[in-house]
């Protein structure tokens, strides 16, 4: 992560000699004010300005094509608009997928059952507010606690935000690397063995690696087991989301079209099945004939549709969304 930032700013003296577009000065200042952007040095601001202009051009051209019916989603200059794809991946998307042989597929599907046409677990009060992971690759932790929060609500009737920081700090021996990445099933195994996880209120998120501070006095949830779904089976993922609750998944989030997504059903042919970002499927549905997965992200409410993204469903496991699904049980 540090190497990437260094590369960007070693080049800053050369970048400052490139010309910004002065006609965008007002819009640049407005964008900075909107998202509270402040830069320590002029060279840093010069770098960010040129990245921002490049992203702005990308957004404008994409949205022009969207207006012509060429895309099912549009883009916007959100709080990530001054970052490159490489930075977003390095700072905010660090999913570490375990070796394939370690997976234990235990889900028993019932292909003959009738499932609802749409599901949104927010409507049942099973989804906490969207969180912001900041410059820490803790996507996996937020995905894991999001799934467990829903199970806690279904079992007890109480919706409680659980501590992603607890997972960041305490699950290293399970293969997780804190802000440098991890995986949801390893997080569940830690909670199982630890006999619990603290609440967010008692163990708040700091977006950095710390010494483990778990305290059983503040335990807010437990986990008895977790279930993994078969690779690439969107039909089984639909069944699990409908019957069990929100499901943890990994996706390919490495494209500007993803981190600058604003609304609609996301479908980018460049998206691969090499997953690098942990998110939470909280439902599914159909928008103007486009089937989608309703996905909760951890990039704050300024991302997408108030922190959510609708991703193409039944499009050949688009972005790898059905590659590594799992959910916990209490």
Curated annotation (Swiss-Prot):
CC annotations in GO: extracellular space; lysosome; phagocytic vesicle
Keywords: Cytoplasmic vesicle, Disulfide bond, Glycoprotein, Hydrolase, Lysosome, Protease, Secreted, Signal, Thiol protease, Zymogen
Propeptide: 18-114
GO terms (BP aspect): antigen processing and presentation of exogenous peptide antigen via MHC class II; proteolysis
EC number: 3.4.22.27
Signal peptide: 1-17
Keyword match Cell membrane: no
Catalytic activity, reaction form: Similar to cathepsin L, but with much less activity on Z-Phe-Arg-|-NHMec, and more activity on the Z-Val-Val-Arg-|-Xaa compound
Gene3D superfamilies per record: Cysteine proteinases
SMART domains to which the protein is assigned, alphabetical: Inhibitor_I29, Pept_C1
Name of the molecule in the record: Cathepsin S
Species of provenance: Saimiri boliviensis boliviensis
